[in-house]
Curated annotation (Swiss-Prot):
Name by which UniProt lists this protein: Calcineurin subunit B type 2
Annotated binding of Ca(2+) 2, by residue: D100, D102, D104, Y106, E111
Similarity comment: Belongs to the calcineurin regulatory subunit family.
Lipid sites, type N-myristoyl glycine: G2
Region annotation Calcineurin A binding: where it falls in the sequence: 131-136
Known partners and oligomeric status: Forms a complex composed of a calmodulin-dependent catalytic subunit (also known as calcineurin A) and a regulatory Ca(2+)-binding subunit (also known as calcineurin B). There are three catalytic subunits, each encoded by a separate gene (PPP3CA, PPP3CB, and PPP3CC) and two regulatory subunits which are also encoded by separate genes (PPP3R1 and PPP3R2). Interacts with SPATA33 (via PQIIIT motif).
Site positions (Interaction with PxVP motif in substrates of the catalytic subunit): M118, D122
Residues binding Ca(2+) 3, per UniProt: D141, D143, D145, K147, E152
Length: 170
């Protein structure tokens, strides 16, 4: 793995040189086995993520090559989504990708159920959660295709102004 300068500027556009150095230092501290990639265990050692029920989904979204680990490039790309300098569209796409598990551009009933199940655990019975999912799909699905597109998701999130609260965790 090279130094910070070995990464194209476009992947680091939300971070200045000092921030990249700080992120590199943090990455190396998390990389306990010095493998140049963070395993699930190493990734979840971040205090910000230890209690997050969606940590596996965050890892899956960060892990763009699908190898089950997060290398420094993926770490920079992923954390840049939380930068206060990141744009609204990127933040919305990141949030959408947490739900779009199969990466087909839509949130299906099953995907919404799985992600909400991660969040609520056993606090709701499955039938109660399914009712919530069904109602959510009906409410958000403006074109009636039975799934939530990025546009439908974005419209709701923008109306709630949730995206303004997606700020840096690094």
């Amino acid at each position: 793995m090279g130094n910070e300068a070995s990464y194209p500027a476009e992947i680091c556009s939300h971070f200045d040189e000092d921030e990249i150095k700080r992120l590199r230092k943090r990455f190396k501290k998390l990389d306990l086995d010095s493998s140049s990639a963070l395993s699930v265990k190493e990734f979840t050692s971040m205090p910000e993520l230890q209690e997050n029920p969606l940590v596996q989904r965050v890892i899956d979204v960060f892990d763009t090559d699908g190898d089950g680990q997060v290398d420094f490039r993926e770490f920079i790309l992923g954390t840049s989504q939380f930068s206060v300098r990141g744009d609204e569209e990127q933040k919305l796409r990141f949030a959408f990708s947490i739900y779009d598990m199969d990466k087909d551009g839509y949130i299906s009933n099953g995907e919404l159920f799985q992600v909400l199940k991660m969040m609520v655990g056993d606090n709701l019975k499955d039938w109660q959660l399914q009712q919530l999912v069904d109602k959510t799909i009906i409410l958000l699905d403006k074109d009636g295709d039975g799934k939530i597109s990025f546009q439908e998701f974005s419209a709701v999130v923008r109306s709630l102004e949730i995206h303004k609260h997606l700020v840096t965790i690094v």
